[in-house]
């Protein structure tokens, strides 16, 4: 049986529907490791300063953001904590749009939403309303310390939640170079 990876509530207006979140996909990939050909032992990665050639202990590592080639701004842990979104355990629906208003290129990762304890009727009502009106709920949720834009939509007898890419994360076709003119085919 699948295990919930998050629990919270779908919220819009005065409505609050407890739900559990499950990943809708299980990627089947083979993971290879680097091994020593002579002994078959797994190789370890070491943190080495390229300027000194010395190994850097974990306690000396800091996070930095590259502002230009080889120029970094160090970001302190308290600065990272200050910008971390507040965990609310709520999927806040901000709008409802027609299903065909979302270009599929913006869909990122699918999840299933199952009703929480005592939420069966409210869950079923939302599922039926979205299905009957062919609408999708556009919402925000914090998962693993990251705020996500998501779409809540019906799929058969279950609500799905798909993380959405922001516009600046999608590569424009104009960045691909010269494409053939479709009128000249």
Predicted feature residues:
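Boundary segments of small protein-protein interaction reader/adaptor domains
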Residues: 1-185
